[in-house]
Amino acid sequence: PVICPSVIVAITDGDRLLLTKYAPSHSSHRQYALVAGYTEVGETLEQTVHREVMEEVGLKVKNLRYYKSQPWSFSGSLLAGFYCDVDGDPSITLDREELSVAEWFDRDSLPETPNLISLTGEMIECFRQGKEPK
């Protein structure tokens, strides 16, 4: 079977976490999510993190920390979760074709966590509780 590797990225700026929402043309999913994307041929997972973050929100990141993986049968994907820190200016440049919203939330003001069985939901909840990998 074919499996598509992809990344889920929790970008932090101190005690803030960047959350996004997909553009209506890109997905019917309306809850907050993390930056995500598929790995391209010849690309490492770490390179995918840097490329997807730059493409979707225009940020440079550093200090990548692998969290865990999760198979996602709906799309035939293997999701790899990473935490990373913003590198420099945290100003967002939004890719409006893919995202409708990207905004920073303080740890104590994060919106309701999406489905906790998803890697995204688990990673957001870990950040909320201060349990993300340092």
What are these regions (language model features)?
Residues Y22-A23, S69-P71:
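An acidic- and aromatic-residue-enriched active-site/binding cleft used to recognize and process polar
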Residues S27-Y32, F74, D95-K134:
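Nudix hydrolase/Nudix homology domain
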Residues P1-L34, Y38-T39, K60-V61, C84-V86:
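N-terminal strand-loop-strand
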Residues L34-K68, F82:
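The catalytic Nudix box helix
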Residues L45, L78, L119:
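Catalytic-loop motifs flanking and including active-site residues across diverse enzymes
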Residues Q70-T93:
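Active-site-adjacent beta-strand/loop module that shapes the phosphate/pyrophosphate-binding cleft
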